[in-house]
């Protein structure tokens, strides 16, 4: 979680930011699985789905930037929210999903995952698990840092003069992004759509 997050903060290539972010997010899955609790396992499964939705949105955002702007270098970007409004909204939803902010599916997944880890730590009275829980919270702050930093550099600030003629992507590129954005919000508001299917299996795995 920490290595991927720290490396993401140091990248200029937006695709590399998302690639290192994926490494960090896989750490969350192992974090939840390691709790061996029903909620922790279910949270890890939900995080897996949320990561697919959120990171899919972010990589599609990178694709729009490459096609419409011609670069994926963060140091050359800025102020594109006014030129790519739909892309910007979808990118924000994708980032919120990865950060675990409501009303996206990432919130419920992350909440269940951390609750499961804390539950196991309290039941066992294990200081190591309690420390891991605290470190997980710190890693979440790191996740928020590199994603907010990315959004600021791409969509906010001053628009470079050479981007004055940039236009929003066509609907062939935007439609899939809007579908994924819709899925993550619907799943965030109605998590039982997913949880009712997987909870019995997670209870069987955890022995709960």
Q: Model-predicted segments: where are they?
A:
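Hydrophobic transmembrane alpha-helices and their helix-loop junctions in integral membrane proteins
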Residues: 1-152
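Cytoplasmic/organellar membrane-interface segments at the starts of transmembrane helices
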Residues: 81-87, 144-208
């Amino acid at each position: 979680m920490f290595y991927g997050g720290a490396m993401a903060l140091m990248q200029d290539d937006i695709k590399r930011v998302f690639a290192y972010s994926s490494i960090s997010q896989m750490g969350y899955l192992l974090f939840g699985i390691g709790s061996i609790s029903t909620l922790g396992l279910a949270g890890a499964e939900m995080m897996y789905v949320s990561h697919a939705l959120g990171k899919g949105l972010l990589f599609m955002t990178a694709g729009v930037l490459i096609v419409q702007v011609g670069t994926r270098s963060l140091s050359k970007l800025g102020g594109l929210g006014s030129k790519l409004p739909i892309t910007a909204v979808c990118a924000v939803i994708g980032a919120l999903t990865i950060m675990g902010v409501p009303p996206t599916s990432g919130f419920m997944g992350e909440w269940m995952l951390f609750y499961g880890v804390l539950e196991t730590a309290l039941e066992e009275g294990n200081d190591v698990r309690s420390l891991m829980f605290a470190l997980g919270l710190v890693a979440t702050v790191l996740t928020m840092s590199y994603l907010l930093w990315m959004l600021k550099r791409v969509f906010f600030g001053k628009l470079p003069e050479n981007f004055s003629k940039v236009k929003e992507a066509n609907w062939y590129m935007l439609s899939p992004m809007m579908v994924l954005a819709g899925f993550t919000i619907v799943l965030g508001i109605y998590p039982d759509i997913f949880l009712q299917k997987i909870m019995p299996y997670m209870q069987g795995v955890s022995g709960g």
